[in-house]
Regions:
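N-terminal signal-anchor/first transmembrane alpha helix
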Residues: 3-31, 114-116
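Transmembrane alpha-helices
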Residues: 16-30, 122, 126, 159, ...
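Transmembrane-helix boundary motif in ABC transporter permease subunits
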Residues: 88-120, 137, 141, 178-180, ...
Length: 284
């Protein structure tokens, strides 16, 4: 049973911890948002030199190809790419992760679980940069020469998000009482029907949580994407890196603006997923 914090010391401690966590979470986000509408000294090559005034010039500059670069990509294209990749990652991660989590939940005390589960968790212990470099080295010859293909990005994102999907689904699948499956089988349901009519409805919340994890991880993934992405198919994090790696106050302001856009897109995506969920299923 959970104990309520009745003493003023415990309440004060909890309040301080919450305040610190809230500050550490909100302060960086507010800093990005405020700097995205701040004016910078464009005559200075130093990044982040603030001047007085509020402006949306940084957002307007995102649509202007100031250097007439052939690799210029408007932010709408980067946002579209990121959302498309994230949608594909959600589908791939759930299609692969659901059977894997189901197998792990049905062999929780076996040698299969003991050795296969750590293998499936390898992306958590491996840097995304290492994963991207491995793709470049391994997939460099026909018929698996995918280095120039945009499909490589959602594949990499799926591998990064895969462990989170399994960890979200496996506990829910393990919590399903065996007698429910047995009752469905006695009534004549096939193994597929048992999975469809018993398992899936009971893990609806976990499925939505897993989908949200996969979606947001894909939106913000940078390490592997930086190595395998093509210049004409950038994501929002890559565009932010392009701006922040170039000197000048204008590029710095554009990086702040695009970072704010990424923050808003991720927040809107999570809210939409929460809004379209079935009532009482998938509640966070």
């Amino acid at each position: 049973t959970q104990k309520k914090m009745t003493t003023w010391k415990s309440q004060l401690f909890a309040g301080v911890v919450i305040l610190i966590l809230f500050t550490l979470l909100i302060t960086p986000l507010l800093a990005l948002a405020t700097r995205s509408i701040a004016s910078f000294d464009t005559r200075s090559e130093q990044q982040g030199v603030l001047t007085s005034g509020i402006t949306f010039e940084n957002y307007r500059q995102l649509t202007i190809n100031r250097r007439d670069s052939m690799f210029f990509v408007p932010p709408t294209t980067a946002i579209r790419n990121s959302l498309l990749y994230a949608a594909v990652v959600v589908i791939l991660a759930l299609v692969i992760g659901m059977p894997a989590a189901w197998a792990l939940s049905h062999h929780s005390d076996s040698v299969f679980n003991r050795y296969i589960d750590p293998v499936l968790m390898l992306p958590l212990g491996t840097s995304a940069v290492t994963l991207g470099l491995g793709f470049i080295v391994a997939l460099n010859r026909p018929p698996l020469d995918l280095r120039a293909s945009p499909i490589l990005i959602p594949i990499a994102h799926t591998l990064v998000a895969f462990p989170f999907v399994i960890r979200s689904l496996a506990p829910s699948l393990r919590s399903i009482k065996p007698r429910l499956r047995q009752a469905a089988a006695v009534l004549g349901a096939s193994p597929y029907d048992v999975f469809r009519t018993v398992d899936l409805p009971l893990v609806g919340r976990a499925l939505l949580v897993a989908a949200t994890f996969a979606f947001t991880i894909s939106l913000g993934e940078f390490g592997a994407t930086a190595l395998i992405s093509r210049p004409e198919y950038p994501t929002i994090p890559l565009m932010i890196y392009r701006y922040i790696s170039q000197p000048g106050a204008t590029n710095y302001g554009q990086a702040m603006a695009l970072s704010t856009i990424l923050m808003v897109v991720a927040a809107v995506a999570i809210v939409l997923i929460e809004r379209i969920r079935i009532a009482d299923i998938g509640e966070f």
